[in-house]
């Protein structure tokens, strides 16, 4: 059983029990979250594809970490002009443990 969900403009393939790092979500460690932007769902025998999302499927999970990725360095320069600019960035993320993929009331 797996699902493809959209969170923060990116798509993630998730399975129950998996820990996935998504773009920052509001909440504290231990909070329950429901991700309802499910694009595709497969239970092993049948595949459901949303157009664009499935209204009756959601992914439930628990926040296990709020953190920041490693730093990336942005370096710009212009040759022979003594122009150099260095900038760093660390993106925030939320690690979510997928507990189950549920079918909402229908």
From Swiss-Prot:
GO terms of molecular function: rRNA binding; structural constituent of ribosome
GO cellular component term, pick one: ribonucleoprotein complex
Keywords per UniProt: Ribonucleoprotein, Ribosomal protein, RNA-binding, rRNA-binding
PROSITE patterns: RIBOSOMAL_L21 (PS01169)
Pfam families: Ribosomal_L21p
Domain of life of the native organism: Bacteria
GO terms for biological process, alphabetical: translation
Subunit structure: Part of the 50S ribosomal subunit. Contacts protein L20.
Similarity comment: Belongs to the bacterial ribosomal protein bL21 family.
Role according to the record: This protein binds to 23S rRNA in the presence of protein L20.
Protein name: Large ribosomal subunit protein bL21
